[in-house]
Design a protein with these regions (language model features):
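A structural signal for well-ordered alpha-helical segments within the folded catalytic domains
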Residues: 67, 71, 227-235, 260
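Structural detector of well-ordered beta-strand residues that form the stable sheet scaffold
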Residues: 83, 142-144, 168-169
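Active-site core segment of subtilase-fold serine proteases
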Residues: 1-83, 98-101, 105-110, 114, ...
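C-terminal subdomain of the subtilisin-like protease fold in secreted/lumenal serine endopeptidases
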Residues: 107, 113-116, 239-350
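Catalytic metal-binding/acid-base residues of hydrolase active sites
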Residues: 27-29, 118-122, 148-152, 174-176, ...
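Extracellular/periplasmic catalytic domains that process cell-envelope and extracellular macromolecules
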Residues: 13-16, 136-138, 162-163, 185-187
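Substrate-binding/access-modulating region of protease and related hydrolase catalytic domains
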Residues: 68, 88-164, 214-228
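Extracellular S/T/G-rich loop segment that most often corresponds to the catalytic His/Ser-adjacent loop
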Residues: 25, 157-242
Length: 350
């Protein structure tokens, strides 16, 4: 559905740049000098974020998790550029200063839209990391983090930074949307989203052992695998906001780049409750982004009741109800102009 306007020629309104997603993990297998490179990692959309330490080359991955996460993001949101920050070598403890430095660079230098962090700790005593997270929110950068890491269970019930108010926490679910048993306990007043986190198949370094019969792929499990999926879904939302008709009104994207706005749309438009009394909302992008037999590409942006226009109005309606009744007015004015020029009528059936 998003393919139709991904290279939109409507340059006056559509944001030129692609959605940018930073992944803080174990690097990616992109250097041919270290062995064969998984085909997807050869993409020019996989880019250096910042070399945080000479001992941590960004284009190498001795653990495999970073390559897996980057592949997940590009599979879910193929429109994005992925910026790689290698914050660890393998299974050793992650230095918080690397994470803080990566966040600061992603926000200030690379101007990313989303940061995916498949990591976490028991406590949040590092002032530099807390400041970086607060700076990211102030700069309208969306932060996603795994709700648990390597079996961490804390008194708070969730790892940090996932439990921070500025961060969207991600739990895991199986292929049917059932919450994984290894998710941490419920945190009071913390929105909980699940994404596929069991048997997640993605790219994997060819020089590392994998049980997958296809070289360069592996199935992995954990909230750390669900996190890049959620980040990719958020990337789809921002890409859609940069296409017509939503791009007619820049304030819509601004709302979506706030943690409150993105949480709202993920809850109301892109997920379903696992059960009435469950704290978990399972993310499913096909709830919002889907096509029909008559509109296999989602339809035109000004076509009444096309899947594209319906998705756009769904987002606008939820934002309007939560934030301001004026949201969508500018978009409506531009659509009226389009209809006056001979576009699809606002009342005509497809």
């Amino acid at each position: 559905m998003l393919d139709r306007y991904q290279d939109d020629s409507f340059k006056q309104k559509k944001t030129e740049r692609r959605v940018k997603i930073a992944v803080l993990d174990s690097g990616v297998a992109k250097s041919a000098a270290r062995g064969p490179v998984p085909p997807l990692m050869k993409s020019p959309r996989v880019k250096l974020g910042k070399q945080l330490d000479p001992a941590l080359p960004w284009n190498c991955d001795s653990k495999g998790h970073g390559t897996h996460a980057a592949g997940v993001i590009l599979t879910v949101c193929p429109y994005a550029d992925v910026y790689v920050y290698r914050v660890c070598e393998g299974n050793e403890a992650i230095d918080r200063k690397y994470v803080a430095e990566a966040i600061n660079d992603a926000v200030e230098k690379k101007k990313v839209d989303i940061i995916s962090m498949s990591l976490g700790w028991d406590e949040n005593s590092d002032l530099g990391l807390r400041a970086a997270i607060e700076r990211a929110r102030a700069s309208s950068v969306l932060l996603f983090a795994a709700s648990s890491n390597e079996g961490i269970r804390t008194k708070a019930g969730m790892a940090y930074p996932a439990r921070a108010l500025e961060v969207i926490a991600v739990d895991a679910a199986d292929v049917h949307g059932n919450p994984s048993k290894f998710n941490p306990p419920q945190l009071r007043d913390k929105a909980r989203f699940t994404a596929l986190g069991e048997a997640v198949r993605s790219t994997y370094p060819l020089h590392l052992p994998s049980e997958d019969p296809d070289d360069g792929f592996k199935r992995m499990v954990g909230t750390s695998c669900a996190t890049p999926i959620a980040a990719g879904i958020a990337g789809l939302v921002l890409e859609f906001a940069r296409q017509r008709p939503l791009c007619f009104e820049p304030a819509i994207e601004a709302h979506l780049k706030s943690v409150e706005g993105m949480r709202l749309i993920l809850t109301k438009c892109l997920s379903h409750k696992y059960a009435d009394n469950s704290p978990f909302n399972h993310l499913d992008p096909t709830i919002l982004f889907h096509c029909t037999e008559r509109a296999s590409d989602g339809g035109g942006f000004s076509e009444y009741l096309s899947p594209r226009s319906s998705a756009a109005y769904n987002i606008v309606t939820k934002l309007r109800e939560e934030f301001s009744p004026d949201i969508g007015m500018q978009m409506g004015v531009e659509l009226q102009k389009e209809w006056a020029r001979g576009g699809q009528s606002s009342t005509e059936e497809n």
